[in-house]
Amino acid sequence: MSNRTSLLGAVTLFAVLSSACAQQYTGPPADLVIRNAKVVTIDHDNRRAQAVAMIGEEIIGVTSNRAIGQYIEEGTTQVIDADRRLVIPGFNDAHAHWASLNPDYIELRYITDKNIITEGVRERVAQVQPGELIRGGHWEHEMFTDKQWPTKELLDEVAPNNPVSLSRADGHSVLVNSYVLRASGITNDTPDPFGGEIQRDPVTGEATGIFKESASSLLNYNAVRVERTPEEQAERSRRGWDAANEMAMRLGVTSIQHPGGGNADLYQSMLDEGRLPYRIDVAGRLTDNADALARYDELRKRFPPEGNWIRFGYLKGFIDGTLGSGTALFFEPFEDEPDKSGLAMMPYEDLERQILASDAMGFQIGIHAIGTKANNWILNAWEKAQEVNGVRDSRHRSEHAQVLIDEDIPRFAELGVIASMQPTHCITDKRFAEKRIGLERSAGAYAWRRLLDAGVHIAFGTDYSVEPLEPLEGLYAAVTRKDRAGEEGDGWFPDQKLTMEEAIELYTLGAAYAQFMEDRKGMLKVGYLADMIIMDNDLLTIPEDEIMTSNVDYTIVGGKIVYQRDGAR
């Protein structure tokens, strides 16, 4: 143990004892102090403070303006005068598909005119060589004027000699052009794979260019490889990651839980270079393969849960699709497609077998589950795992837990299952939810209040890049349940709204609990990691229409200022 670690341990213990005994702090001076603030700690034993003191990575004082002076030494301690601004724990995104930013990606989020797709592809074709793959996405057909799915005809005229792949916003459907269909050998007779659907013209039976879920595995892009030198590729990667990291810091995201995978060694190299400004959990894929589980176990030993920066110990699986793509798995058919009730990504027996094997190895498991039947299945499988493997503090997770039947809500608490939810999905999906599943089933959608009242642990995230990496949009969604345009009224199923402080807690302490880190992250408390943000507005008191336009003034990770907004004092 280093002298620095020993010192921090002693300082932490002394600070706790000092607080309990109302003694003066006499330890070493703080490295960083925030004072004259409105500190919302998320610590139920000490909800409010005015100042925070830090040494190294840890918090050593959460106190009043009067008492903070004892932590300050001129010339040693950096002091931020918050001028009564709000200080809260840093946002911990419990579900983000994290990646570097691709400058060549065609961004189609929020478009309402399908012709923008054509023009975006036309512009990109002019910049690439024939045969080079063109990628883009985040389009949402429910936002189009006609609310109809796009088809390959939007792409064929402008990209006859390039493969084009444009993902729907949810990432569960993709639009491709005829170049890709030919390269893939897709014909009218190509069958749908298990857990997937090739969308077809109802008259001709011809593929429209939309491939849902596992059907995308049939696609062969036959793309020309872009030749870059190793130096060019390294610089391109560096720029992409630096842009992504800057975005996270600008938005106050100090921790990321990456359920889709992630390269732990890449993050370690960035950490070693001083370029990793957030903490991150990476994941593996749910399996019952003994060799794969053994490899995951070795990775867990290299990046153990006791670590604070890069951690591994979570396996992710899928059991259904999404509401927007019409592939979420329900007990009853869809209202707008009565011949369909969603797609299972695997038979229940396979799900149960994989969960039993992974649970027996002590892994935390998260399953993508949107529909009522999907969530019921995963609860049943986890109940079986407890019967077979025994009960432990597993904290398995329903990733999304979007639409639930009444009987399953208390089962989350009974089984210790975490509802890992993304509040912006509520205000995105509510545009079409009642059309797809009706009013009665919609009452069980994004049921935050009912889950909390039942004693269920909830963790909030964004599902980036399905939704923007914008925690403030999530907070707005949680407290209003209104669309981003600020519609009139009380919001969609307003009885499920949260208070702002509850929503912040689910983005901080709730997310930390979901990764077994509630003992050292998610609160502003002595001995906890010094991850926090200073806001330009008081989120607890401002009008709801100002929430999404508020800004993070400072982002602090491990006691270091990693972001300061231009013009922020």
Positions of predicted regions on the chain:
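Bacterial N-terminal signal peptides that target proteins for export
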Residues: 1-10
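Bacterial N-terminal signal peptides
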Residues: 9-19
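Divalent metal-binding segments
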Residues: 22-35, 40, 44-297, 313, ...
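His/Asp/Glu-enriched, well-ordered alpha-helical/loop segment
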Residues: 228, 356-366, 370-396, 400-401, ...
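Acidic (Asp/Glu)-rich catalytic clusters
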Residues: 270-275, 300-307, 389-391, 412-416
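Short proline/glycine-enriched turn/loop segments at secondary-structure junctions
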Residues: 303-304, 543-547
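Glycine- and charge-enriched low-complexity intrinsically disordered segments
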Residues: 564-569
